[in-house]
């Protein structure tokens, strides 16, 4: 099992094995440390933050490691297209010690959209099975409303149950 994080100085995603002895869950915290909301984490001497900054949909890693097919759960609708970061000037100021991270954030929308198109191509080829919410309208990545979270979870759960035969066929290669 691996966790993805963004190494701020090298402008790249990095994957780390999950150590069972990490009693403070430092690596896990770093993998979801959103800019501005969390501090920069030091992992093995490297400043790190949210893995999604460098690799928002990390399906290529599975393919590079020998998987022939992937199941991907998207957190946004299939139609979602990421726009350039409105807060880029703030990112540049807040993370000026990490210019490569700022570059990553500047290119994040293009990288996400390219990754998304690649996933759709893999899906057409029968090499990817995608799940995506029907709607995330009114839902924010820092959502605290338990009912909204529960409703979005239930939507995903229901779709998973409805598509169970499709998942089993995909996994068996038929």
Where do the language-model regions lie?
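Patatin-like phospholipase
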Residues: 1-174
């Amino acid at each position: 099992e691996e966790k993805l994080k963004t190494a701020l100085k090298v402008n790249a995603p990095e994957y780390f094995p999950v150590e069972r002895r990490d009693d403070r869950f430092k690596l896990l915290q770093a993998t979801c440390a959103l800019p501005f909301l969390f501090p920069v984490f030091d992992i093995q001497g490297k400043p790190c933050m949210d893995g999604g900054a460098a690799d928002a949909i990390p399906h290529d890693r599975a393919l590079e490691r020998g998987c022939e097919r992937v199941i991907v759960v998207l957190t946004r609708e299939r139609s979602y297209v990421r726009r350039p970061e409105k807060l880029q000037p703030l990112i540049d100021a807040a993370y000026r010690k990490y210019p490569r991270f700022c570059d990553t954030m500047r290119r994040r929308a293009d990288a996400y959209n390219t990754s998304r198109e690649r996933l759709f191509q893999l899906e057409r080829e029968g090499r990817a099975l995608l799940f995506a919410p029907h709607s995330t309208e009114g839902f924010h990545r820092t959502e605290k409303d338990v009912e909204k979270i529960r409703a979005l979870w239930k939507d995903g759960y229901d779709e998973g149950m409805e598509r169970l035969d499709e998942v089993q066929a995909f996994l068996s290669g038929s």
